[in-house]
């Protein structure tokens, strides 16, 4: 993967993370249970982050082990292949806590 493609993929992760941040900022945890559109949008952004992570070279991910790539990709796989088993509490925790942290870490990598 070229440096350009790597940077593009990282910027895509930031874009999806920013979308989740905008969604979560306007809502509360309970909204995942009552607002199907919000839940589906949140799920999709998490899936897209995981999909982008799979495109990053494995050796590059290994050299940036401060980011839990395996967990990110596993979450994507669970959402794609068994989305009905993802509990709203887990999705909220990922969207409200894990994704903003990931976004900050990716932005630092892009600055280097």
Q: For each predicted feature, which ranges?
A:
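Solvent-exposed interaction patches of small proteins and small membrane subunits
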Residues: 1-112
